[in-house]
Regions:
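Active-site ExK catalytic segment of metal-dependent nucleases
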Residues: 99-101, 110-116, 125-137, 146, ...
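Metal-dependent nuclease catalytic regions and adjoining charged, substrate-binding loops involved
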Residues: 1, 134, 138-142, 153-227
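Secondary-structure transition/capping motifs at alpha-helix termini
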Residues: 119-124, 156-160
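Extended, structured, electrostatic nucleic-acid-contact surfaces
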Residues: 217-245
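N-terminal accessory regions of nucleic-acid-interacting proteins
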Residues: 240-310
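Metal-dependent nuclease catalytic cores that hydrolyze phosphodiester bonds in DNA/RNA
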Residues: 1-123
Length: 310
């Protein structure tokens, strides 16, 4: 996401981040106004990106050998220059266009490859279909959403929706998908995202742990918020379901939970589990207030743990 003065420019990647976590999109929006800092990429992430770039370049060479009439859109140019170059290349009918760039209002994005097909369009007896490389061998719905976005943007130039779109996985296998089967979902999600961005000031949104956290560039910012608020999710080994149940009883911080009378908690949580979490919350509160680490010895249960060792 790019924010310039009062304008917000979004991409298919931003759309995927929004689907994964609304708060990611909110942090993207507030990055500069609130001085938020992105998490530095780990060595694993750097390696993953390098493999992704190599995978893309590998297929660029393969496709260039197959389609000699090809062109690369210069990614260092301005958005408008890239878009105009893409339109020009499409109208000239290049068989392969690498890094085609699309603009529809404030929605814009760059496709890995678009390849000429024999489908009739406003251009004549041809149109284009999207091919996008992914280093992963296990494709996800977000990957399909991304190529659907590019296919939609192509239709704004050609006047016709591409029939197919392709994902090239880490095994170099091609996965075709019918654009028409995913278009409505894409439009719904895009509309929802745009509505979200238009009224973020009126929304009461708080970061929650989710599957996206481990890959999120804003993870450190959320951690700072949780630590500052002493949020209930800081209790070790507590899960999302348990958090939601405790919050319904007003127990939204570690301190409130630690001070709560277990007998008055009506949440449907296994008794032993609730007692363990409560004990853990008290230990963490002790550490937070005194700076000293305390430990409780857990009662031994015959037949479990070290008792199972020969």
């Amino acid at each position: 996401m790019r924010v310039k003065k009062d304008q917000i420019f979004i991409s298919p990647s931003d759309l995927n981040n929004f689907v994964s976590c609304n708060y990611h999109a909110l942090n993207d929006l507030n990055e500069h106004s609130k001085g938020l800092k992105k998490k530095e990429p780990s060595e694993d992430m750097k390696l993953w990106r390098r493999y992704g770039d190599e995978h893309e370049k590998k297929h660029l060479n393969i496709l260039k050998d197959k389609y000699s009439n090809n062109i690369t859109i210069d990614p260092t140019k301005s958005d408008d220059e890239r878009f105009n170059s893409t339109i020009d290349a499409i109208k000239k009918g290049y068989d392969l266009i690498y890094k085609a760039y699309f603009i529809e209002g404030k929605f814009r994005g760059e496709a890995d490859f678009i390849i000429k097909t024999k489908q009739k369009s406003d251009l004549g007896d041809y149109s284009y279909e999207v091919y996008d490389t992914k280093i992963t061998k296990n494709l996800k719905p977000k990957h399909v959403l991304q190529v659907t976005a590019y296919s939609y943007l192509i239709s704004k130039i050609t006047g016709v929706l591409p029939k197919q779109m392709y994902l090239i996985d880490g095994n170099s296998e091609y996965h075709p998908n019918k654009v028409s089967e995913f278009l409505d979902y894409f439009k719904f999600t895009k509309s929802k995202f745009e509505s979200f961005l238009s009224d973020t000031k009126d929304q009461s949104l708080y970061p929650e742990t989710c599957n996206h956290c481990n890959y999120c560039i804003w993870q450190d910012e959320c951690l700072k918020t949780w630590e500052a608020d002493n949020y209930i999710n800081q209790v070790a080994r507590i899960n999302k379901s348990q958090i939601n149940k405790l919050k319904k009883e007003g127990l939204d911080t570690v301190e409130k939970f630690a001070n709560a009378d277990l007998k008055k908690i009506k949440a449907k949580i296994n008794k032993a589990t609730l007692e363990r979490l409560h004990q853990q919350a008290n230990l963490q509160e002790e550490k937070r207030k005194t700076g000293e680490s305390k430990c409780d010895v857990i009662d031994q249960i015959p037949g479990q743990g070290f008792y199972k060792m020969p």
